[in-house]
């Protein structure tokens, strides 16, 4: 009996060793993933020195709309050379701000931690009013929390569910952008299900889709639940303030037979951007 048990003990020992190796490899792989991919999600581990930090952010900028060609190659090289001489992370951020203007163009910028919080604190909800049977909904810019986004979208959708509506005015004049997800979900009773708009990111096309009151593919995925569709005339109002996600919302109505657009030309920021939380507490909007 003891002789028969020895092979079993050896097998158990081998299994234990294999499991231990797998655990170590898994931990190492996980650490590598966090280190290599974490910065794209605001996870900076281990704490980077100024040079490593700057290099990683330049890598993120490579996805910028203008991060191709000789101009970006030169700007990137200049930034990298300056970063090598930097002694603090804040000094690196100043260098990165210059590079960001080239990689991302006019629709890119750095936000201080306080400025990012100000956007949340300055949340403005949509409003609505009825004049006879014509409903007007104001669709302001939005850059708040997920909870505020749900409230924003639901407020719009509920207003569009009013009884006896014979026409709708969608007021985008003060919409300076933000998160398109709650905007489009809230206006879903006016939009047909399917592809609402499309985004081209690094040569690949991504469709922003609407299905049963849920928006996906652009901005924060947001749902107001399945709502009845309003088949009424729609007037969309614009101004020179209408920008970014406000312009994307305007584009969602493009080509619909029952829609007319009135107002001044928009600001010309119809590109979309991505937020990257940085190690310094700032947010890079690219």
Where are these regions (language model features)?
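Solvent-exposed loop/turn segments at secondary-structure junctions
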Residues: 141-145, 174-180, 196-197, 203-207, ...
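Short acidic catalytic loops
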Residues: 135-138, 156-178, 236-238
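Extended, small/polar residue-biased N-terminal targeting/export presequences
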Residues: 53, 67-132
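STAS-typified acidic loop motif
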Residues: 124-150
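Terminal peptide-recognition signature
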Residues: 57, 99, 137, 170, ...
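Gly/Ser/Thr-rich loop/hinge elements
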Residues: 177-235, 271-277, 281
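N-terminal Sec-pathway targeting helices
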Residues: 4-32
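Ser/Thr/Pro/Gly-rich low-complexity linker/stalk segments immediately outside membranes or between
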Residues: 33-52
């Amino acid at each position: 009996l003891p002789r028969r048990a020895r092979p079993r003990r050896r097998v158990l020992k081998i299994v234990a060793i294999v499991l231990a190796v797998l655990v170590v490899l898994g931990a190492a792989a996980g650490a590598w993933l966090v280190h290599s991919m974490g910065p794209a999600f605001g996870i900076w581990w281990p704490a980077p020195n100024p040079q490593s930090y700057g290099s990683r952010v330049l890598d993120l900028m490579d996805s910028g709309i203008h991060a191709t060609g000789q101009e970006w190659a030169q700007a990137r090289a200049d930034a990298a050379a300056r970063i090598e001489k930097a002694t603090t992370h804040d000094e690196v951020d100043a260098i990165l701000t210059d590079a960001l203007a080239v990689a991302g163009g006019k629709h890119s910028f750095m936000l201080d931690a306080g400025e990012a919080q100000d956007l949340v604190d300055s949340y403005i909800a949509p409003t609505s009013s009825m004049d006879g049977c014509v409903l007007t909904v104001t669709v302001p810019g939005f850059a708040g929390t997920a909870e505020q986004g749900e409230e924003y979208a639901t407020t719009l959708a509920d207003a569009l569910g009013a009884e006896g509506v014979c026409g709708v005015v969608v007021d985008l004049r003060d919409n300076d952008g933000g998160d398109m997800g709650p905007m489009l979900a809230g206006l879903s009773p006016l939009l047909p299900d399917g592809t609402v708009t499309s985004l081209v990111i690094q040569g690949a096309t991504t469709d922003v889709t609407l299905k049963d009151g849920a928006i996906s593919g652009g901005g924060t995925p947001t749902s107001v639940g399945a709502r009845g569709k309003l088949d009424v005339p729609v007037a969309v109002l614009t101004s020179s303030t209408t920008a970014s996600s406000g312009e994307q919302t305007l584009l969602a109505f493009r080509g619909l037979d029952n829609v007319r657009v009135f107002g001044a030309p928009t600001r010309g920021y119809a590109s979309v951007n991505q937020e990257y939380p940085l190690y310094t507490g700032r947010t890079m909007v690219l």
